[in-house]
Amino acid sequence: MRTLYAACLVLILAPPIESAPPDVEPGVIIVRGDRAVSTDGPRLPVTEPHLAVDPKDGNHLVAAAIVIKKSDLSVADCATFVSFDGGMAWTRYDLSLPECGDPWVAIGEDGTILLTVLGRAPGQDDRPDHLLVFRSADGGRTWQGPQSLGTGHDHETIAVDRSGGPYRGSFYVASQAYAEEVSGKTRSVAFVARSSDGGRSFSPPTRLFLSNLSLNTQNPVVLSDGTLVVPFGDYARYTDKGQLWLERERSWILTSSDGGKTFSVPMLASEACQKSFGTLAVDPSSGPFRDRLYWICTSDHYENVLLHYSSDRGEQWTKPIRVNQGSGTSPYVRTPSVTVNRDGVVGVAWYDGRNGGARYRREFICQEIYFTASLDGGKTFLPEVKVSSEKSCPMLPQNGEIGWRWPAGGDYMGLAATPDGQFVLLWADSRSEMYQLHTATLKVNSSREE
């Protein structure tokens, strides 16, 4: 086991987050921040961030991102970032892995933090697809690990059980993996493993053979009774000449009531999501939409941010609801993310190219970060607001191959709700000629304050 020690990271300071004044009308979104992360040492591109907020302390933020050490993507590490003052100052930890990607963080019930990444395991084989788990018991100041959950993984994510169910406090790790079925053929499977001891160890994983199609799992969530919900999407079939893309990609939901040992049949959520990782969120509030599931994704050609919701634990889903109402006649949107705060307010953020000018090869355009919220359980959305104060353009010399690989800052970005109901955003932004992290905080005034 290795312990990683800190080097200081400071943000360019901005005025602290202010609450909405008493005369602000319901439905107003207040943006504070757009603060650039500034680090000592070599200036390297940082991309694909993920963010977690301590459910017991909104000033305690933990993030992770990919650090690109060579612009041709041949060398990449990951780093974690921790803040104890609401994101004004941060401390950075470099994992110092020989190869790293897909970072994801989660804070447990007792404050234990888990970080998962894909990478090469130190002292083991040279495979770059180990699912590696790091653990911090001191709020993110130091890290122990990694332990490997095996090879052949992609897009691993974490969920924490904060329910009143029998598995409260558990961490769930989900990923797409490969396994050999009884016929001897290797299939794409959904992989789920549970830890009941704060990430020190994991139960034998469940590997789900769902079809003969290529699939990717997405981020799981846990309902108020402890039911685990795992989304996945299938997108291609195997042929003698390689993978053949399906005409329509499909999004599915699986549920488990026994801690991830067994699962329901796949329940269809959408056939409208194309060319992106979807994101799942659940309403944790005690309000009228408690346990409502929200699925966010992009449509074909990156034209729309689409939201679907289910009020019956994933059995039935609404038709897609367009979120980006103000994107114009030639919309371009990417990397949407969704979360729900303590009051049941649904927050959605995405990269938007409405002001980006001419496109290069259809998919490469300058973008800005936009945010909106729903106060009625996803039926309607407030007018979206621009969060970033400048455009981010991916195709820049200092970004190198990174702009081609991640034209919108990564396959995902960080969006989380604080215990007092605000939303915190963390994204990769190349306004400074290469991808660097930026953060902002948003308050949605969901009711008139007295």
What kind of feature is each model-predicted range?
Residues 5-16:
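Bacterial N-terminal signal peptides
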Residues 19-450:
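Extracellular, repeat-based ectodomains that mediate carbohydrate processing or recognition
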